[in-house]
Amino acid sequence: MSKYLISLILLSVISMGVSAQRITRQYNNVSFSAALKDLNARQDKYVINFVYDELEDFKVTKNIKNESVPDAIMNLIGFYPIKMKQVDNIIIVECIQKASNRMMGRIVDTRHQPVDFANVALLNVSDSSLVTGGVTNENGQFVIPCEVKKAIVKVSCVGYKTYCNAYRTGEVGAITLEDATINLQKVMIKGHRKYISRENGKLTLDVQNSNLKNIGKATDVIKYIPGMLYTNGKYEVFGKGEPVIYIDGRKQTNTSGLSLLSSTNVKSVQLITNPGAEYDAETRSVINITTVHHSLDGLSGIVGAEISKHKNLSNNEEVNLNIHKGALDVFLAYQYDNTRSDIRYDVNQFNYEQDTFHEISASEYSDRSRSHDYNVGMNYAINKNHTIGGRYLGSISNYKMLDSPFDYMQTYKNDELLTATDNKTEESEKERFHNVNLYYIGKLTDNLQLNLDADYVYAQLKHKQQVSETSRIDAVSEITHMRNDQRNRATALKGVFAWNMNKNDRLDFGTDFSKISSWGMSVNEEGKIADDQFKNKETKYAGFATFSLSASKWKGSIGLRYEYIHAINTDQGEVKNKTNYSDLLPSLSLSTMFGRVGMNLDFSSRVNRPSFRQLNNSVSYNNQYHYEQGNIYLKPQYVYDTELIVNYSIFDFKLDYQYIKDYIHPTVVAVSGKPGTVTWMSTNAKDFQQLGAQCVVSPVFGCWRPTLTVGVYKPYFTLSYNGEQLDYNHPYGLFAFQNVVALRNDWLFRCDFFWNIKGHHGIYEQNGYSSFNMMVQKQLLKKKLTITLKAEDLFDSSKLNDVKRVNFVAQNRKVNNFNRCIIASISYNFNSFKDKYNGSGSAEDEINRF
């Protein structure tokens, strides 16, 4: 049973007058666990706690002479990734690298003598980038924990020729170094670690070993993922839409969690553009953020403030605290955001239903949004195999339209002026959000782990709107009041098993359940629009399994996800739609290496279900000719996505083909009895296809790290417009050139250019727009204090301009969000704050659909 000993604790009775105990011992090629066990038995002043299996692979050869127990242990540790912590008479020894695999061996010379203090580096077999490394001990032995199953072992030592060879993880035996003749000269060697890599189809940014470490917040880090777009506060993966973001396995419902995470605490960021069966069926792309793990007891945190100037000033303040004591973590976070924003619309719309109605409108609004976000929770490690925790997330948000400098509309019927109005809009929203999550993470056996999550969610949105329309012709005013109230509730449970069947095979399987209800009403006091009461209910049962295997140069996985949905949509107390969805969604991944060229083939099938906003029947009033409404008959769309990825050195290529069945897109319908008046809503088309390609180049030139991303997508889509078939097939593209220069004395400079190239995005033909951004940053007080100055959209070139043609309406819309701005921020870190919550949440997809 010694192989499975969790910790060795020998209780000692310390009597008065006992002097300090010293140790003299000789250890020759014994395991670290055996040496600690021996030290513990030979004295009674200290109690040594450790995990036997964790340290057994580390061999030690050491002569201990008259040393204290702590000094003897530190002497044994040497260069191994092991740390010792002493609390009074308790000594805790643990491996600081918790990887599941280990590369182990012994370095000798041609005379079979051990080579000590040799550098052993593990390199990625695909691109030779550094994975991790270690140093040999006095007996020439090394043990290096790592996450990979195969790596290039590179051994270097002064006086010997460098050795390189590929091995599978485990015991590699003895490696012999040949002698080398060296002419010593004054030489400076400077290396650069590759910070963008691709493995098994997943694009990874090594944040800790790049200049992104000090960029600011996690929100800033994500912007520098190749192929990532950031427009008006939203992230979008090129050709894939909005991604789902995870932090340490915990799904994020908004960007507040990202803004509370400092980039210094981000270890890596991973982009998955073709998720497998383990992810929810509606997920088309995933961003996984892994944070740096700290184990220091005490208080840690971050405080920060930011001020920005667009047309108006906005400000943001935050404080995050984390208290870590032994097995308990308690964390609290609060953020206040006061955002002033401005937006201008210019709309030119033609309605060809029967007569020709031509609408010309222009409006500009200034509004304010104030929000309070808070997060409190705890994690408790019962022991090394079992952890429990919980958290509460809350948000209070209030929105109000402050001013409308101008808002007018002119309508022509068959080229004759029909109406001309000056409009005044007053609008406000109150939003409340509450989420309670409980979780359990347990290691049931050495090869089987279980994750459990339970969620309860409640959200409420109240919206009020008053639109005053004054005729320029007869000065008659007309007022329209709209009031909407929507509430959402969800409960969810999720369980996931991870079974390491053997060294090369793994099976992940799990299930989740959720029950959602959404209800509300819309009221028009003047009776122009019929009042409405709606209620939506949805129950979901889901299960998945993913089998992963590796053999020689090949790695692969096959997954299957099943979801059953029972949905009921009620309007005005009458059941309008009662549907059962039963979907079986397969996924497949295959990767290999041909020399230094890596290849990956992925296939996934997903389903995107309508949001409750798209389904509810309430009407939003824009003006007398323009409404917006949900569609209770809207069906889910099914996405089938195939990717081929090839990477070599600094180059990364991707080909992508997407087929979407029952494609969801905007459309327009006429309002009965009101000529010229239309309602915009979502509907389904038969299908949609697009073919895409993307190339990323990421070299390093000294202190300059440029990244070039070029991509293009060609859509294939046809709809009926004005009695004829219209193709929406113009390709759209992306060009991004990002540059970072790391200067001396902790100065950092960035200069980035983004260009979205004109083309069709569904029914929208979007004109090209661009953004040129600059940033300078300085760190002080040993990098605890960070001061940043940014200038975004310097040339004011990010204005949107699109044309949509559908059914009998053509609309040209120009939008100016006044993105040009200056941002100044300051943040102070103490003890490197990190949110340590380990739960993943089980209701996140339901929250997003609200």
Question: Where are the predicted features?
Answer:
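Outer-membrane beta-barrel signature, preferentially recognizing the C-terminal barrel domain
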Residues: 535-538, 576-579, 607-661, 679-692, ...
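Short, acidic, small-residue-rich periplasmic hinge/interaction motif at the N-terminus
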Residues: 36-43, 80, 86, 90-100, ...
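Face-selective signature of the C-terminal outer-membrane beta-barrel domain
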Residues: 373-398, 423-572, 593, 597-598, ...
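Surface-exposed extracellular loop regions of Gram-negative outer-membrane beta-barrel proteins
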Residues: 290-305, 344, 348, 360, ...
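Short acidic/polar hinge/loop motifs at secondary-structure boundaries
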Residues: 143-145, 224, 250-276
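Outer membrane beta-barrel strand-and-loop segments of large Gram-negative receptors
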Residues: 490-494, 540-542, 635, 641, ...
